[in-house]
């Protein structure tokens, strides 16, 4: 099958800059990399095609030959061809991605590893700890302790991983390098040694207590300081308290993820608080002083006369002091007018008399009701 034009493969024009060619290749390689598409032959073919195109167009000499003669100028089976070569991940692939690709697909670059001979070092995995706290603790701050998984040196083999009296040998597969070269088609790549898993060592007789790991799992107590104003989903990082590194690599970090319990009175919206405040019909009509709950205690508030159901009042600075802004939010009080229940006959008579007197006053006492009645009349008369 005829090869596609290299510029077409990468989706760039013939006047594309080196940077544009590199960006286009990175995008395609990320999309079709075998680690992301383990069972897709089509993705594997597209990955190889993009890699070949990049290797040609990123090399000035090969690019010039391709621009002048097309595939004939670079095909090793044709006279004068340069050939795709066998650069593998050490050539165009590594050049284009550096440690970015290593972070995604677990290569040593960018993870505390080192290139060249010898076992590869890997950064330990990060740990996540989910912690649930109250709204009050989130608002005011909170010091606590947590217990997290921890690894201690095995007291039987003293961290060697081998049964006492036995030795640790150089891995016969990778000869201590920690990696092996694997050929795939026209290029090769390095992979972690399947026998020693990157350590470069082989333990014929593993420790019977730690099973060759050289460490034992335990629990560790950590002090955690929850800052005032922390919000739902925020994370606190504890550096170096994640999983231990491999082959001398640095440990990962511990992330404490905060979840806030539902509160009986308040709902939080960022640094603001909302609460529903039931008041009596009489207080809504003639006004009065009420006590409003806040996280700092009770606050007095005067309800103006004629307050309608659903009215919202804002109490400035009665919310939560933001962990980032440093300023306190506001408290929004939503008024709910409570309808009295289980009335006595005397109370019912009084309300009927009151209702009659209100209606005799016309729209002066019930402007919203009168406005609604006018709209209804207009609807039926139209």
UniProtKB/Swiss-Prot annotation:
Stored SUPFAM superfamilies: Chaperone J-domain (SSF46565), DnaJ/Hsp40 cysteine-rich domain (SSF57938), HSP40/DnaJ peptide-binding domain (SSF49493)
Amino acids binding Zn(2+) 2: 171, 174, 193, 196
Zinc finger (CR-type): 141-219
Keyword Amino-acid biosynthesis annotated: no
Co-factor note (free text): Binds 2 Zn(2+) ions per monomer.
Residue stretches making up the J domain: 5-70
UniProtKB keywords: Chaperone, Cytoplasm, DNA replication, Metal-binding, Repeat, Stress response, Zinc, Zinc-finger
An example molecular function term from Gene Ontology annotations: heat shock protein binding
Any Pfam family hit: DnaJ
UniProt-annotated binding residues for Zn(2+) 1: 154, 157, 207, 210
Main location: cytoplasm
Keyword Coiled coil: no
Cofactor dependence: Zn(2+)
Swiss-Prot/TrEMBL CXXCXGXG motif repeat ranges: 154-161, 171-178, 193-200, 207-214
Subcellular compartments: Cytoplasm
Stretches that traverse the bilayer: none
GO annotation terms (biological process): chaperone cofactor-dependent protein refolding; DNA replication; protein refolding; response to heat
Family indicated by similarity: Belongs to the DnaJ family.
UniProt subunit comment: Homodimer.
Function, as annotated: Participates actively in the response to hyperosmotic and heat shock by preventing the aggregation of stress-denatured proteins and by disaggregating proteins, also in an autonomous, DnaK-independent fashion. Unfolded proteins bind initially to DnaJ; upon interaction with the DnaJ-bound protein, DnaK hydrolyzes its bound ATP, resulting in the formation of a stable complex. GrpE releases ADP from DnaK; ATP binding to DnaK triggers the release of the substrate protein, thus completing the reaction cycle.
Domain statement: The J domain is necessary and sufficient to stimulate DnaK ATPase activity. Zinc center 1 plays an important role in the autonomous, DnaK-independent chaperone activity of DnaJ. Zinc center 2 is essential for interaction with DnaK and for DnaJ activity.
The protein's name in its UniProt record: Chaperone protein DnaJ
Chain's gene name: dnaJ
């Amino acid at each position: 099958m005829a090869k596609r034009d290299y510029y077409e493969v990468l989706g760039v024009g013939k006047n594309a800059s080196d940077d544009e060619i590199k960006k286009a290749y990175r995008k395609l390689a990320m999309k079709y990399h075998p680690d992301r598409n383990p069972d897709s032959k089509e993705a594997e073919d597209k990955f190889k095609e993009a890699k070949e195109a990049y290797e040609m167009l990123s090399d000035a000499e090969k690019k010039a030959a391709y621009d002048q003669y097309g595939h004939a100028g670079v095909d090793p089976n044709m006279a004068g061809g340069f050939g795709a070569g066998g650069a593998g991940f050490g050539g165009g692939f590594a050049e284009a991605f550096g440690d970015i690709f290593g972070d995604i697909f677990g290569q040593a670059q960018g993870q505390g590893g080192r290139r060249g001979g010898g076992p590869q070092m890997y950064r330990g995995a990060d740990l996540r700890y989910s912690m649930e706290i109250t709204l009050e603790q989130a608002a005011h701050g909170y010091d606590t302790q947590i217990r997290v998984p921890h690894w201690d040196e095995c007291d039987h083999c003293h961290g060697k991983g081998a049964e006492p009296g036995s030795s640790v040998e150089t891995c016969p597969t990778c000869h201590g390098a920690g990696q092996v070269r694997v050929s795939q088609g026209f290029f090769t790549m390095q992979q972690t040694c399947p026998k020693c898993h990157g350590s470069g060592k082989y333990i014929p007789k593993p420790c019977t207590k730690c099973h060759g790991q050289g460490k034992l799992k335990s629990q560790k107590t950590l002090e955690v300081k929850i800052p005032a104003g922390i919000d739902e989903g925020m994370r606190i990082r504890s550096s170096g308290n994640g999983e231990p590194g491999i082959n001398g690599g640095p440990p990962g970090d511990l992330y404490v993820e905060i979840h806030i319990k539902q509160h009986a009175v308040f709902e939080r919206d960022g640094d603001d608080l909302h609460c529903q405040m039931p008041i009596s019909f009489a207080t809504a009509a003639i006004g009065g002083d009420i006590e409003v709950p806040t996280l700092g205690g009770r606050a007095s508030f005067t309800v103006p006369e004629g307050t309608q159901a659903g009215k919202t009042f804002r109490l400035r600075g009665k919310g939560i002091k933001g962990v980032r802004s440093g300023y306190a939010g506001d408290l929004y009080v939503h008024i709910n007018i409570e309808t009295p229940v289980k009335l006595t006959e005397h109370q019912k008579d009084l309300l009927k008399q009151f209702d009659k007197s209100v209606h005799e006053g016309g729209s002066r006492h019930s402007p919203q009701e009168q406005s609604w009645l006018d709209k209804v009349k207009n609807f039926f008369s139209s």
